């Protein structure tokens, strides 16, 4: 089933007009930032949801489809905000606090007022706005699904750029996720400055290099 506006309509009936869907990309990666996006859909999308036809959980879409829909979201959203937390802060704070920080950054980057939040799976402490945390929210809420695509495309572009700076790791291919290619590169070259040194595969690569 594709995400829809059922949850958004329910919140609007309760008096919350501008709703921000929030999601992240890159939480489980071995390298690179965690990126979050916040998306407020426009009244036009609520009247005509097929303006964002094809929006789904970003993991279910091809890279080409994500790029196309990314453009549609930017065109039809009332506001889009992005937050980026780099690997060294992930190591300093831990991945969950870093994810929340990226989400708060994305919320603060929105160019429009927000009445309530619909978030994929987590709550944001210290934020006074009403929050609805949905497990697998990117499969249920169109706002969250749109945010997941913005976050994923933004992060993929960053990792493609990082591939030019650190060409030995294959970042353009795997985007920092754990793959056999990535593991072999870690074993051969050791971690780059973009690697999360508190993540177990990176720790193992460091220990192996120290012992060799």
Swiss-Prot record:
It comes from Chloroflexus aurantiacus (strain ATCC 29366 / DSM 635 / J-10-fl). Manganese or magnesium. Binds 1 divalent metal ion per monomer in the absence of substrate. May bind a second metal ion after substrate binding. This is Ribonuclease HII. The keyword Manganese applies. It is found in: Cytoplasm. InterPro entries: RNase_HII, RNase_HII/HIII, RNase_HII/HIII_dom, RNaseH-like_sf, RNaseH_sf. GO terms for molecular function: manganese ion binding; RNA binding; RNA-DNA hybrid ribonuclease activity. Residues 17-211 form the RNase H type-2 domain. CDD domains: RNase_HII_bacteria_HII_like. Transmembrane segments: none annotated. Pfam families: RNase_HII (PF01351). Gene3D superfamilies: Ribonuclease H-like superfamily/Ribonuclease H. GO terms for cellular component: cytoplasm; ribonuclease H2 complex. It catalyses: Endonucleolytic cleavage to 5'-phosphomonoester. Its EC number is 3.1.26.4. Signal peptide: none annotated.
């Amino acid at each position: 089933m594709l995400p829809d506006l059922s949850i958004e309509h329910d919140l609007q009936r309760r008096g919350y007009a501008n709703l921000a869907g929030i999601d992240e990309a890159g939480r489980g990666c071995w390298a690179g930032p965690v990126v979050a996006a916040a998306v407020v859909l426009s009244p036009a999308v609520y009247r005509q949801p097929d303006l964002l036809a094809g929006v789904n959980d970003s993991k279910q879409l091809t890279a080409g489809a994500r790029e196309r829909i990314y453009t549609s979201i930017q065109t039809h959203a009332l506001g889009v905000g992005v937050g980026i937390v780099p690997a060294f802060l992930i190591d300093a704070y831990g991945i969950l606090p870093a994810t929340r920080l990226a989400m708060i950054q994305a919320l603060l980057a929105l160019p429009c007022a927000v009445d309530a939040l619909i978030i994929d799976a987590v709550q944001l402490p210290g934020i006074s706005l009403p929050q609805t945390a949905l497990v697998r929210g990117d499969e249920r809420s169109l706002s969250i699904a749109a945010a997941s695509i913005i976050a994923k495309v933004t992060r993929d572009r960053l990792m493609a750029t990082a591939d030019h700076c650190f060409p030995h790791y294959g970042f353009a291919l795997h985007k920092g996720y754990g793959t056999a290619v990535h593991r072999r590169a870690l074993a051969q070259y050791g971690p780059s400055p973009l690697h999360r040194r508190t993540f177990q595969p990176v720790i193992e690569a460091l220990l192996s290099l120290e012992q060799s």
